[in-house]
């Protein structure tokens, strides 16, 4: 019981709508809240096979992606500390048919509000319903931005942008990442990414080694992604 109380107290500090809930709604969430510690590489939500519920990241990093008919992956967006994901509970919104997979990119601690619990509260609470709509709109804005990148931006610019994003996330210019991983994020093929990275290396932008990419000239990468 004591551990459960600590879990709920921690959740209160992360869930932005806690103070907008009434006593019964708070109890409903507290009684049904799921805590999960997942290892890097764990699939948390798997397309239309699951209706996991609302995810709230306490610490760690998640990746939300879709699969093409050919099995190629492309990252839609990532989730970091205090981020929430609704696409893992899209089954509660009949107008949304969006099959995504959610994977832990790092060891992650998270909370899950079961889909039916969240759906019930959303029907009762205008603040929760409004916030849900705003969050969903933000995520679809992210997806539309991604589509624009794929349609109108050349691969060299997208790779440069991805490498700069990774250095910002990891806080280092030495990235422990494979060419296959980059291909999965960008919806490309490993061989294509390898050729592009070798071109970058020839231009003095990066240095390649086994399982690692070192950024040598971030300013030129920034210029490339903006050009």
Predicted regions and their residues:
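Short alpha-helix-to-loop micro-motif enriched in aromatics/charged/Gly
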Residues: 69-76
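Cyclic-nucleotide recognition modules
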Residues: 77-133
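Polybasic "coupling" helices that flank or enter modular domains
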Residues: 105-106, 123-188
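Phosphate-/nucleic-acid-contacting segments
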Residues: 155, 164-227
């Amino acid at each position: 019981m004591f551990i459960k109380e600590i879990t709920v107290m921690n959740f209160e500090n992360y869930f932005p709508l806690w103070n907008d809930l009434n006593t019964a709604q708070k109890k409903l969430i507290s009684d049904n809240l799921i805590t999960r510690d997942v290892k890097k590489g764990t699939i948390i939500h798997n397309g239309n096979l699951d209706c996991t519920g609302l995810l709230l990241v306490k610490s760690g990093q998640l990746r939300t992606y879709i699969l093409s008919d050919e099995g190629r992956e492309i990252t839609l967006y990532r989730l970091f500390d205090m981020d929430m994901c609704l696409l893992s509970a899209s089954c509660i919104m009949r107008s949304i048919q969006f099959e995504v997979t959610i994977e832990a990119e790092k060891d992650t601690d998270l909370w899950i509000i079961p889909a039916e619990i969240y759906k019930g509260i959303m029907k009762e609470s205008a603040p929760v319903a409004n916030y849900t709509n705003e969050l969903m709109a933000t995520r679809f804005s992210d997806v539309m931005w991604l589509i624009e990148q794929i349609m109108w931006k050349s691969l060299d610019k997208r790779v440069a942008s991805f490498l700069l994003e990774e250095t910002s996330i990891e806080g280092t210019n030495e990235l422990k990442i494979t060419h296959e991983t980059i291909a999965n994020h960008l919806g490309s093929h490993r061989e294509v990414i390898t050729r592009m990275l070798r071109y970058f290396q020839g231009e003095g932008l990066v240095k390649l080694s086994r399982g690692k990419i070192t950024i040598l000239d971030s300013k030129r990468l920034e210029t490339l992604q903006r050009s």
